Structure formats: C-alpha cells, structure tokens
C-alpha cells in the first residue's frame, strides 16, 4: 500500500455597467411626451442606438446616481441576462448571455471591459464607480472593432471629461442604516477655451456581504478611496486631447459565510488505528448550526484583500477633414494583496491555514486608428493595437498535512514504515509523533503577455441600408512559469512544475464580423449580424505536479455567432422597443471547474512530483491529494432572445421592462467533476475519491455554462409630481431571477425578486435632490452561490476532517438609506 500525503496547491489571485436598458437614458424630467435619441459609440463612432446592428444596453452617469449604483453587484438589477458576482472578495466574475468567466482562469475575459476605450480588468474598473459619463454593454462576440476579442460581449465605461466653456459639477452623499456610506463629486474648471480640468473623487464604505465572523467577533467591511484628474487640451479646432490620471485604493475584509449543521471534525485516535477505527472527539466543534439567514462565518483567520492602482490614460483625436486620426494609450500599475485563511469552513478547529498572495502587474496599451469621416456612401477604417502585461505573483502559503483527523497539536503513533522504510507498515511506532507535518509552500509565477493586432473595416450607408464588416489579425504571445519551493518538514525546490512544452504559446487568430442594418421606416430598423471571436488557452497557475497535460494547459477557444433583431418606435415615439434573437456555437469553450479533488503521482511520501510512479485510484491511500481549480475546454452552444420595451406614457412617467432568455449549455461534454460515489454525475457523497483512471474524475454533461438561470427580467419606473419649482417623485426598480437546479453543485436555487424603492424631492431646475430609499424591500435572504459540498481536508492515514458546512453567498438583507445630490 502506497502511503500518500494530501497536499494543497496554491490558489492564486490573478489578477458594468449600470447599463440599464435604453429607458434609463430617456428618463429625464421634461415636458415632452416622447423618448429622445440615444447616442452610442459601440461601433467606435457616434451613432443613434437604433442604427447599430447589435444588441446594446446603455446607461448614463445620471442614471447610476439616481439608482445609487455604487457596487458592481447592483448593476445586474438593470440588465437582464447579466450576472456580476464577487463570491470570494478577490475576484469579479461576469456572466452575459449565460456565458461566464472567472478571472483566475488566466485567459482573456468572456466579457471584455474597456475603460475610456482601453482594455482593463474588472478588479480595477468595477471597484470604484463614480463620475461616469456613459456605460454601454455590447452583447455578442466582439472580434473586430476593439483590441481584445471576446465571445460574450464588451462593456465600455467612459468617464466624464471637462468641457471648455463653463464651470459645472455635482456632489452626492449617501448613508445607510447598516453602516454604509458613499460620497462622490466631480467638477470642471475651465481655464480658457483651450484648456480645462476636471477633478473627481470617491470615498466609500460598506459591510460587503454583511457576514459576522463568530470566532473573530468582527463583521465584514470594506473601504474604497479614489481620485481622478482629467486635463483637456484643445489647441485648435481640429485637435483635442484628454490626459487622465486615476488613483484607487481599496481595502476589504470579507469573511466567508458558512451554512450547515457544523460537525465534530476531530477523531480520538485509538490503538486500533490500523484497523480503521476512529472514535469521534465530541468535545471540539467546527461551530454552531448555521442557516443562510444567520449571515455568519466560522473562519478563524482573516480574509483581507487590498488593491492599489495607478492608471494613466491619454486620448487624442485629430480631424484631418477627410478622416480622423485617433490615439488612445494607457499605463496601469496595480498591486493586489490577499491574506486569508484557506480553511474557510473551519474543518480543522484551532488551526489557521494562512495564504499570502501578492500580485503586482504593469499593463501598457496603445491603439492608433484612422477612419473616414463621411456618414453616407463608402466609409473605411484601419487600426493597430498593442498591449503588454508583466509582473510576478508570489505566494507564501501553509500546506501542512496531518497524519490523522485529530487535533493539530496532538501526538499519535503512526505505522512503523512511515519513519523507517524497512519496518513493517502493519505495526505502530512505539512512541507518538506530532500529528502535524509542517510544510510551507512558496510559489513564484512570472507573467509576460504580449498582444498585437491589426484591423480593417469597410462601411457602406445609403438609402436606409448600412452594411459593415471587417477583419482583425492578432498575434498573441504568452510565457508561463510556476516555480515551486517546499519548506519545513518536507523540503524541495525551487522547481519549475510546468512542462517545458507548455510554457510558451503563440496564437495568430483572424477574427471579425459582418452586419446589415436596414431602415424599413424612419421608426423601424431590422438588422442581421455575424461575429467570430477567439480566445487563447492558458496554462494553469500552480497546478499539481505530475497531472496530465489537458489539466495543465487549455486549447484555444473559437466561437461563431448569428443574430437578428428589430428596433423601433411606436405611438409617436412614446414607446421604443428592441427584439434580438441569437445563436452561438463554441469550439472548446474555456471554463473553470472549482474545488476539484485530484490524485497525483508521488514517490511514496505523498508529495506530487514529476517522474514519480503512476497513480492507482483503486489502491492509493488517501485516495486524493487535495482540491484544485482546473481550467478545461468543452464544446458548447448558446441560443436565446432579448426584448426591451421603454416608454414615456406621460411627460412625467417613465417606464421600462426588459427580459432575456439565454440557454447556454455544454454539448455532451466530458469535464472535470467530483464524483465520490462513482455515479458518473457530480456528487460529494462520502470520502473524497477519484472515479476512473485519470488524475480527476470526469462527468458527461449537457449542463449550464454558468451558475445562472436561463431567464431574467428587469423593470424600472419613475413617476414625477411637479408642484411649481419643486418635483416630488417615486422610483422603483425590480430584478426578477427565477429559481433553477444546478447540476454542478447539486443545489436547487430559489427564485429572487429584488425590489428597490426610492422616494424623494427635486429642487428648482433639478439643482438638488433629496432621496430616501430601501434596498431589498421584501427582505429576501436567498442563497445566490453555494459550494459543491461540505468543507473537507483529507488526513494522510485515511481519515477526513469534515466541517459540516458549505460555503455560501446570500443576498444582502434589507437596507434603508438617504441620498443628497447637488449640481452646479
């Protein structure tokens, strides 16, 4: 029998939109009983929304302020089919049209984010939302008009820029009954008609997930400070430049919520250990029984994440008459730090499994474009894009192992062959040894990614017909490395654990699209669009040594999408509507499967090692070495329909309803899973073990790509009651999310009806506004995300620590607040 030690691989930290539907942009107090045109830059030129041949959601900065959108997780209330989550406090996950992305998978995102037209990461842009001009959500594959190809869509965020003719600005302050506050302001200071400055700032604090940590007697809490300065320079009528600097500092302590009865994880080790007899030690519990509504954590250690970012952005436009030459460039330096206890459910009471991860990185980006200025006839555009990201993630993490599922500080006898290879394994040592085998893991992960692309597109517009298409050729090079060192009772390294053949990758995809838009009447457009996108695969960070190549490196992903739509206005433009239907097919969808138990080769000491004897899932003890988050390719298909209706029935009533249906499924895919019971379907019944002959279990699935329902609906309205110079108003916001069953985590999620209500008074000329509000009016406390099983840690000699808890995220409880807003 081969004795093995369970080891834990380092889990690294890699690295919105209030896009409401169009109605939000219409909801301006006024006397006209009709909606107004919305101008978007989805196609890199200013166009009316109805003339754009794709499904686009829009929100202005004013709407973000009106609906108190301070947190990225609140944005999904404004756009059906969009899921924005941060389940761990250290990674923002975006899902659109049922297509999800986890930042830790190391690929380009499924939904690419652009901040002032420069690609950036969600950790930077979503952390501080303030002084925003407009946010646009572009649905469907994006492989032509912007530098990074994305299969699900793009989100563009444009901050407010200074004007050159008047002093103007705003200030807003919010406080809630649950310790939350948000203060933001922005103002423009023009020096003359050629030079102007805009200054903006934010301070924010809140309880994040509202979880109380029982062992530490503390609540989750986060604080964010940010400042932004934009200098506008217009030396001539033909040249305009904007230089922006933003500083961001965020510090969050977000404890992991637990759900379940708890347990007595320790065993009292008797003399009959070799016979497999373990007597539970009922004197020590992982914690009390906890329901979802308790908002409680039993995590004995902390969970602190910090983000410090400097971002410089330059944009310049030179009008040459017949064309416009545009440049955007940026330099970003970020430092992310995560300090946490990996034993989030307290499977080992009295022991903190610390993990300290530091991720500094630099990103330099530049794009040069030249496009024709003519609106009618044949237009064209060409561009070149370059981006490089560098940095080295360092990990200092406890990877200690335990002989038995007993108290870490206890002393117990072990089989004689553990200390003396010549001794028999069926006898115990005559003396006890420490139950803890102390090991510290040190990991260095250098990152070097270069992307260069060249694009060309043609556009014809005339007689109500617009045809646009083009191609983008990309060269993407990436170098991956993971250097592992073990220190303590087991020493090894430093050692490169990624095979040499998988460390370097170069991809040269050709992406693009074609769209046709036709105006049937002045108020009715029909369109059809095709898009092709590509994402490079990735090499897993700190993967267990010796696992198969398919678990280390993923292949590239390709996708083709087809969309048809209708956009129009009726009843003298009192009602606008959009309808879009789409179908998308993935070749090798890049997905991430979290918490997957694995078995790796070793030399008999339980340490994963290259060149060690092969695994035997039938006889290895313990049967697994730990859990890890693996990236994997799989075929998939997506199909659906999106509908929006926005209206202004009267001059003082705005109404919007939007719905999205997206059925995103794997296509008979074989994917990593936990199958302890050997049923061929995901389960965590009993002691962790591997089904089959591979390093992990595999399950055949036609399940969801994301932990999200197929259907989503949002609605919002504002009703105004003008009384001379003053206007009382009431606003409502509804987000409906039906329940669904998750095959991956074996859980039946309940439906959610999120209702936010706002009541307030607006002053003369809308110069000030005072609003009282309540979030989660119904006080629903529903599980929004749950782990696949109870927190467990395998001991070396066959027993298991079981916490009796599953990690969960629960919708935040009802919260009352007040907001004051002034404009000048």
Regions picked out by a protein language model, each given a short descriptive name:
Residues 371-381, 385, 461-467, 583-585, ...:
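Gram-negative outer-membrane beta-barrel transporters
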């Amino acid at each position: 029998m081969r004795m093995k030690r369970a080891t834990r691989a380092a889990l690294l930290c890699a690295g919105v939109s209030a896009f409401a539907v169009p109605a939000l942009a219409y909801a301006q107090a006024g006397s006209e009983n009709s909606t107004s045109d919305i101008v978007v830059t989805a196609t890199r030129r200013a166009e009316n929304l109805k003339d754009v041949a794709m499904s686009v959601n829009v929100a202005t900065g004013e709407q973000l302020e009106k609906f108190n959108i301070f947190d990225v997780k609140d944005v999904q209330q404004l756009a059906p089919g969009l899921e924005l989550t941060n389940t761990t406090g250290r990674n923002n996950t975006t899902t659109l049209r049922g297509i999800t992305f986890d930042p830790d998978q190391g690929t380009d995102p499924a939904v690419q984010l652009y901040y002032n037209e420069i690609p950036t990461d969600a950790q930077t842009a979503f952390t501080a939302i303030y002084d925003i001009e407009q946010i646009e959500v572009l649905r469907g594959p994006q492989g032509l008009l912007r530098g990074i190809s994305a299969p699900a869509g793009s989100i563009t965020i444009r901050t407010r820029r200074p004007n050159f003719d008047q002093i103007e600005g705003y200030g807003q302050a919010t406080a809630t009954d649950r310790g939350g506050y948000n203060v933001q302001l922005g103002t423009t200071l023009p020096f003359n008609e050629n030079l102007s400055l805009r200054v903006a700032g934010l301070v924010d604090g809140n309880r994040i997930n509202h979880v109380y940590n029982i062992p530490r007697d503390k609540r989750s809490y986060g604080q964010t400070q940010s400042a932004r300065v934009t200098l506008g320079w217009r030396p001539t009528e033909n040249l305009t430049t904007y230089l922006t600097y933003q500083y961001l500092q965020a510090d969050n302590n977000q404890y992991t919520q637990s759900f379940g009865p708890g347990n007595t994880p320790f065993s009292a080790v008797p003399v009959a250990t070799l016979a497999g007899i373990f007597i539970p030690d009922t004197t020590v519990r992982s914690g009390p029984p906890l329901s979802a509504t308790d908002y409680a954590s039993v995590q004995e250690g902390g969970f602190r994440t910090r983000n410090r970012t400097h971002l410089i952005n330059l944009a310049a436009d030179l009008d040459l008459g017949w064309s416009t030459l545009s440049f955007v460039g940026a330099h970003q330096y970020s430092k992310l730090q995560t300090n946490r206890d990996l034993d989030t459910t307290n499977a080992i009471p009295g022991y903190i499994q610390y993990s300290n991860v530091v991720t500094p990185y630099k990103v330099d980006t530049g794009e040069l474009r030249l496009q024709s200025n003519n609106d009618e006839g044949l237009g064209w555009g060409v561009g070149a894009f370059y981006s490089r990201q560098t940095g080295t993630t360092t990990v200092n993490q406890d990877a200690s192992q335990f002989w038995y599922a007993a108290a870490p500080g206890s002393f117990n006898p072990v089989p004689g062959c553990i200390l003396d290879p010549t001794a028999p394994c069926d006898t115990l040592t005559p003396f006890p040894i420490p139950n803890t085998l102390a090991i510290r893991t040190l990991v260095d992960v250098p990152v070097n990614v270069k992307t260069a692309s060249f694009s060309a597109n043609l556009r014809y517009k005339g007689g109500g017909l617009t045809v646009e298409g083009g191609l983008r050729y990309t060269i993407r090079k990436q170098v991956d490395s993971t250097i592992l060192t073990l220190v303590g009772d087991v020493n090894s390294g430093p050692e490169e654990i990624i095979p040499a053949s998988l460390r370097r990758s170069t991809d040269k995809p050709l992406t693009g699209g074609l769209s046709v838009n036709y105006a049937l009447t002045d108020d009715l457009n029909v369109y059809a669009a095709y898009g092709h996108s590509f994402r490079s695969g990735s090499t897993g960070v700190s993967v267990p040594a010796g696992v198969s190549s398919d678990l280390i490196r993923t292949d590239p992903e390709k996708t083709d999408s087809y969309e048809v739509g209708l956009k129009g206005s009726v009843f003298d433009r009192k009602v606008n509507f959009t309808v879009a239907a789409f179908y998308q097919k993935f070749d090798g969808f890049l997905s991430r499967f979290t918490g997957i138990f694995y078995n790796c080769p070793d030399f008999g000491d339980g340490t994963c090692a290259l060149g060690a004897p092969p695994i035997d899932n039938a006889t290895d003890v313990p049967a697994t070495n730990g859990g890890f988050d693996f990236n994997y390719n799989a075929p998939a298909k997506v199909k659906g329909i999106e509908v929006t209706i926005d209206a202004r029935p009267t001059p003082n009533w705005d109404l919007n309803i939007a719905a999205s249906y997206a059925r995103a499924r794997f296509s008979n895919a074989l994917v990593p899973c936990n199958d302890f019971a050997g049923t061929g379907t995901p389960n965590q019944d009993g002691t962790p073990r591997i089904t089959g002959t591979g390093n992990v279990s595999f399950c055949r699935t036609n399940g969801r790509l994301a932990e999200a329902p197929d259907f989503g609906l949002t609605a919002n309205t504002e009703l105004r009651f003008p009384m001379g110079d003053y206007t009382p108003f009431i606003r409502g916001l509804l987000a409906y999310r039906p329940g669904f069953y998750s095959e991956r985590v074996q859980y039946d999620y309940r439906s959610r009806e999120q209702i936010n209500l706002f009541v307030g008074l607006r002053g003369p000329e809308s110069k000030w506004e005072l609003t009282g509000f309540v979030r989660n009016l119904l006080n629903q406390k529903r599980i929004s995300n749950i782990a696949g099983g109870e927190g467990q840690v395998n001991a070396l000699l066959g027993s298991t620590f079981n916490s009796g808890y599953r990690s969960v995220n629960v919708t935040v409880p009802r919260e009352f607040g007040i907001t004051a807003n002034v404009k000048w």
